[in-house]
Amino acid sequence: MKEVHMKRTSTKVIAAFLLGASVAGGVATAATSEPLGVKVCVDKRTQAIFLAGSNGCTTSRTALTLGAPTIDVKSIASLVTPTVVSIKVVAAAGSGSGSGWVYKSDRTSSFIVTNNHVIASAATSGVITVELLNGDTLPAQIVGRDIAYDLAVLKVNRGNLPTVTIGDSSKISVGESVVAIGSPLGLASTVTSGIVSALNRPVTTGTLGSESFVNAIQTDAAINPGNSGGALLDSQGRIIGVNSAIATLSSGGTSGSIGLGFSIPINEAKRVVDELIANGKSTRPVLGVFFDTTFTGTGAKIGRLSPNEGAEKAGIPAGSVITAIDGVKIADQVGAIVKIRSYAPGSTITVTVTLPTGGSQSFRVTLGTAPSN
């Protein structure tokens, strides 16, 4: 997991690494479209979900309530924990541990999503091992990874694993209850809960030349080193974020959770993950500008334009300062990059700028595409 140091001069968050469900065969999912408070029985062996009868559940099944008006952490943990895995990496470039979750599974193999920084040291050589809830350990291979989004996909040769249910991060609100599941400090299947503290929080992680830019979900659910790549879930057990970073005090006196955790929104992550599975590589959106890194004012100043890219085609002049994107205020260059990367290539966005000649103007810009690093 990455540790984050908050800078008081802006809303930007500079992060450092935090290292440390549907069921098998598509029988059922952790979240359903049933009304709130549906009573179900979960088969202890297969994890298949059945509506509870008038006499309750048999001894071979566990009684749970899905979608209760107040978040039912016990139910969510029981349903989703089997989809979350522990990841261990041993490599010459460094060893570590983290978390991941099963995204897709067929009869012979499964795809697992985690953070790039969890497995980066084994990108060229090393051993990656995935541990399931039942204690089974499986060798894993890297399918693809994206440094810019801090995401990676692993493959294991074990099929019919329970998979997590995908939620919609665009529909969550500040104050909503959430649950985090992962393996902090190697402690597998650790479950914590909290709320969504903020949305669209600009977070950068990594070092110069290998930075990740995340339009993060902020949560106060306890997230600690080793939680990287784990699941952030909504009140119905659907994944809405990939846990990636935590904030720490700049003094370095506190290295664990201080109630400031950050997750990659699942809508953003899913696009990248699907591309990695399909092609082994992914893409990122391009505005077509080079920012003036010496600019110290509010906003992101465009130093120059890329020929024939979106910004130039839209008529934005060089020297303009971006102040908002789709109505979201932009405080600085990082905020602009993070916001742009939250879109898919080909999206059309509204960019509001202060013109070099003075005055404000909005432009409709279609984002280009480029290979992600």
Model feature map: region roles:
Residues E3-V38, N55-S78, G94, V130:
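Glycine-rich, low-complexity segments
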Residues I112, A311-V334:
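Conserved PDZ fold ligand-binding element
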Residues A68-G297, P307, I337, R341, ...:
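Serine-dependent protease modules
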Residues G135-T137, T348, S360-S362:
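A structural signal for beta-strand boundary/capping segments at domain termini and interdomain linkers
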Residues G37-D43, I87:
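A short beta-strand micro-motif
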Residues D43-Q47, S54-G56, H117-I119, R158-G159:
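Acidic glycine-/aspartate-rich tracts in secreted/extracellular proteins
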Residues A120-S121, A324-T352:
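PDZ domains, with a preference for the canonical peptide-binding region formed by the helix
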